[in-house]
């Protein structure tokens, strides 16, 4: 709990004066004011977050957190939980979607085992920080203890602290965990007080009958556990996931260290939502990578006040959207740093 409390105490609002100064710098580039649209918003936010009007773009890292879910035993997913460790091994071999798109963006992928029901051999690119071998079935009991939830959050915070020490310029979130759309739907339903049906979709591609079953299972879990929306740790522990907790910690740690954090899709945003509920200033450090096909994602984004960069009908997770968005954010920073001013170009303003 000490690491979590320390991170929360360090999070400050982004400096409004820096945002204005970055915009003034952009307005002096050889273009009509505002003509690069959302690229300008990304550039000024990146500069203000880092506290540097000429931010250097060094290493970019996508942290893909992996964990299993007890709720899978209720038949809420198209795939068995054995796919979680199989996909982790695919990440480590460089063969997954996130690997391909991260390579394209010039980003590194680091896989974090925070709760997979499998014992991995130590491998390059794998960070083993296992809190438990998956969550428990939240349709029957609490997914985690409060202590487990905090421990998983602190895994993410520690990784953000290490990223700062390494000089990493931007971090992205990703995840792998069969069944993890169910806790994500439960989390937003708990905070928003909405019906489970409003925020639950097909995940990996389940049919109509399976979707109805999934909705009933999630509702049963919420009815049983009664998570307190005024207590984010209670929501996380009762109906969340270990990888979701790890993502929440990475987002909190990024905000505490003034590192821009690119949040992927539905499950990653569930983690970001926990972080924002723990500290309202966290949202100022988040770049929402994309608008997911999962219907609960829009409600999450509205709640944290985030505007998605991309809308490509993505629903894979892993950090794929984050990797893609990183390239656009980097492009926006290059505009801020490399585009000529009117004076430099000899152009009349």
Curated annotation (Swiss-Prot):
Gene Ontology biological process terms in this record: cobalamin biosynthetic process
Gene3D superfamilies named in the record: 1.10.1610.10, 3.40.50.10210
Key words, A-Z: Cobalamin biosynthesis, Glycosyltransferase, Transferase
Active site (record annotation): 318
SUPFAM superfamilies reported for this sequence: Nicotinate mononucleotide:5,6-dimethylbenzimidazole phosphoribosyltransferase (CobT) (SSF52733)
A Pfam family reported for this protein in Swiss-Prot or TrEMBL: DBI_PRT
Reaction(s) this enzyme catalyzes, per UniProt: 5,6-dimethylbenzimidazole + nicotinate beta-D-ribonucleotide = alpha-ribazole 5'-phosphate + nicotinate + H(+)
Secretion signal, residue range per the UniProt entry: none
Pathway the protein takes part in: Nucleoside biosynthesis; alpha-ribazole biosynthesis; alpha-ribazole from 5,6-dimethylbenzimidazole: step 1/2
Disulphide-bonded residues: none
GO terms assigned for molecular function: nicotinate-nucleotide-dimethylbenzimidazole phosphoribosyltransferase activity
Assigned EC number: 2.4.2.21
Family matches, as CDD domains: DMB-PRT_CobT
Family: Belongs to the CobT family.
UniProt function note: Catalyzes the synthesis of alpha-ribazole-5'-phosphate from nicotinate mononucleotide (NAMN) and 5,6-dimethylbenzimidazole (DMB).
The protein, known as: Nicotinate-nucleotide--dimethylbenzimidazole phosphoribosyltransferase
Origin species: Geobacter sp. (strain M21)
